[in-house]
UniProtKB/Swiss-Prot annotation:
This is DNA polymerase IV. The active site is at residue 104. GO terms for biological process: DNA-templated DNA replication; error-prone translesion synthesis; SOS response. It catalyses: DNA(n) + a 2'-deoxyribonucleoside 5'-triphosphate = DNA(n+1) + diphosphate. Its EC number is 2.7.7.7. Belongs to the DNA polymerase type-Y family. Disulfide bonds: none annotated. It holds the Pfam family IMS_C.
Length: 392
């Protein structure tokens, strides 16, 4: 019997939960994390979500939808610190942990020697309890035989959910779910599938023939059909010393059409990936930006530097041209990702400006040290600062 050894961890309203761990008196209130002026909602409590507040809703609109919404500013360094602690707890259960984003990831319990599903469930329940007791946040878990089904399961009973999908029941588990539960099907895509094609539930998709699916989803129809059947052979990818690339992606709750907002997301990913590259003693040469549209089509484009680097600055000028080359359709985006490849650990060759580069590297090392000690926002790049209106 195949055991449900793939686990998806999804922290509940992560940014807000981290803030409420510091301000427990606000638990149970309608609150959200975000910028009050010209900002967007980064995370909303479940009480605020019940009033119609979602991510990434503009703050001004959120306050109209929910006038008694309590706005909480970002606490510098808090989220990365709690995220690191959360995944360290995961690694006490298994070394095979994939950090998919700051608040979610996968665990592979295959090598742990569990004999029964009950043993696995007991161990994961224990991890869920540890996270709540030690970090004062909650997380939801999905257990299945593959990543796709585990991810869907983890989101069904939030907050503090725990859903197990036994082996062999994947298609049966997915069939009655709304089509919007499949990864990549956002609200607008779901509205189109329901309104134009009558595909309301996952089982409705499976009732369509191949030709019709291709007409609806284009080249991505096989991926959609396999997803509806619960088929997924992707392994849990752990970080290791001989990594051939470093990557990060972000899927948006609502499609984003703002070029400036996507630029900020990409630069934030650069800022989060390069310290890890430095920590590993590596340098990278190539940056690739990938975008995905609501219909699951995607495009990517990459550029390479003349020499490998472990600094952020050389990659910032590539963000705008790469986005323009990848984002060719005049449509909002559902997902964006950044990937660094051309990984090397050889010293940079001496050049005319080698001394200046070494100074920048020493400065980066100091900033990394400060941010590790006090949090990742102790020292920020200019583009990380929220835009503020001029004084009146």
């Amino acid at each position: 019997m195949i055991l449900p050894t793939i686990v998806h961890l999804d922290a509940d309203a992560f940014f807000v939960s981290c803030e409420l761990a510091l301000k427990p008196e606000l638990r149970g209130t309608k609150c959200a994390v975000g910028g009050r002026e010209r900002g967007i909602i980064s995370s909303a409590s479940y009480e605020a979500r019940a009033c119609g507040v979602y991510t990434p809703m503009p703050t001004t609109r959120a306050l109209k939808v929910c006038p008694d919404l309590i706005m909480l500013p970002h606490t510098g360094g808090l989220y990365s610190r709690v995220s690191r602690q959360m995944f360290e707890l995961c690694e006490t259960l298994t070394p095979l942990v994939q950090r998919n984003s700051i608040d979610e990831g996968y665990l592979d319990l295959g090598p742990c020697g569990f004999k029964t599903s009950a043993e696995i469930e007991q161990a994961v329940h224990g991890l869920q309890h540890k996270i709540e007791q030690q970090l004062q946040i909650t997380a939801s878990f999905g257990l299945a035989v593959n990543k796709l089904v585990a991810q869907i399961a983890s989101k069904l009973r939030k907050p503090k959910g725990f859903v197990v999908v036994p082996s062999g029941t994947e298609a049966e588990f997915l069939a009655p779910l709304p089509i919007g539960k499949l990864p990549g099907v956002g609200p607008k895509t779901e509205e189109r599938l329901v309104g134009r094609h009558g595909i309301k539930l996952v089982r409705d998709l499976l009732a369509r023939g191949e030709a019709e699916l291709e007409a609806i989803f284009g080249d991505g129809w096989r991926e959609m059909r396999d997803g509806a059947l619960g088929i997924d052979d992707r392994p849990v990818e752990t970080e290791h010393e001989d990594a051939k690339s470093y990557s990060q992606q972000e899927t948006f709750d609502e499609d984003i059409a703002s070029f400036a907002e996507i630029e900020r997301v990409v630069k934030r990913m650069i800022d989060e990936l390069l310290p890890k590259i430095r920590e590993d003693g590596k340098r990278v040469r190539t940056m690739t930006v990938k975008v995905r549209y609501p219909d699951f089509s995607q495009e990517s484009h990459g550029r390479s530097l003349s020499a490998g680097t472990d600094l952020e600055a050389p990659f910032y000028p590539l963000v705008t041209p790469l986005l323009r080359q990848a984002w060719t359709k005049k449509r909002p985006l559902r997902l964006v990702s950044v990937r660094f490849s051309g990984v090397e650990d050889t010293p940079v060759q001496l050049e005319m400006f080698a001394q200046n580069e070494e100074k920048r590297r020493r400065l980066a090392a100091v900033l990394d040290h400060l941010n590790r000690r006090g949090g990742d926002a102790v020292v920020q790049h200019g583009h990380q600062l929220a835009k503020r209106p001029p004084p009146r």
